[in-house]
Amino acid sequence: MSFASDCKDEASTIKDMPGHCKMASLEAMLRLNSEIVRTNGHFIITFLSANSHVAVYFMRLIKDLYDAQMELLTKEATKFLKKKTYEVVINSQCETIINDMNLFLNESPNHLDYESRECCKKSYLRGAFLARGSVNDPARSDYHLEIATRNNIEAIYIQRLMNSFDLNAKISKRRNDIIIYIKEIASITDFLRIIGVSQMVFKLEELQIQREFKNDLNRKVNSEIANGFKTLDAANQQLANIQCLEYNYPLEKMDPKILLIMKVRKDHPDSSFKELLEILNNDYGENITKSG
């Protein structure tokens, strides 16, 4: 499972919402990833997702708000369809849903109602992310979270919602899609917190602590080799970071090299980074380079 899928799985578990927040999430999902067709004089709405939890979440919203008849279809992966896909087909109440949300129009008066409530803004962003959002694995250094749409008015609206939370969201074009994206790790963390995925926020923050610890160690090692002095304040900061990791993060999931560095630092709290390098090399056979 990818980090983005895990985020969507957690967001799909959120149930305790008032009706107006459910409407906000549902409208976002319909606007970004649904298709409306007319068959034998009746409308049918379909919603597609590669995530089963998202499909079930969508069905729950429809059931709670409209008690409509639905069916869930599964499409297996093929060479043309890269992932297994879940299709929700709404067979009743479609005209009511379409009229309530003005889905045949490029813009909806409901948008103004959502903006008047912070809870609805968060719910709309949650629905948009579930429908067509993605986020890079935080283990990578190229931080990126995005929501895609094919409607320019919708893109501007989503950007406005995101930036009402100071996320510095920007818009770009990619083939047939308009992309609303954020790049800063702090903004990505805030966005995930806004849509309610607290467990994934915790995981993201722990990975950040690990990366900062390792990067800080490498910087200090290089500084010690170049300048030949030891900084006690830096060592104390390293010990504080180690204590934070040991208290908050499952150590069995950490890189063994990081665990070894943490142990050596705790065993030698007053040693310079140059001295730590020698201990790691002589006692443990670990050669730490500039790249770690």
Model-derived regions: residue spans:
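Sequence-level preference for short, compositionally simple segments enriched
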Residues: 1-43, 50-54, 72-82, 106, ...
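Generic amphipathic alpha-helical segments used as scaffolds and interaction surfaces in large
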Residues: 45, 49, 115, 145-149, ...
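Short acidic, hydrophobic short linear motifs in intrinsically disordered regions
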Residues: 36-45, 140-141, 272-278
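Short charge-dense sequence patches
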Residues: 1-15, 103-114, 143-144, 208-213, ...
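Extended mid-to-C-terminal alpha-helical interaction segments
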Residues: 196-290
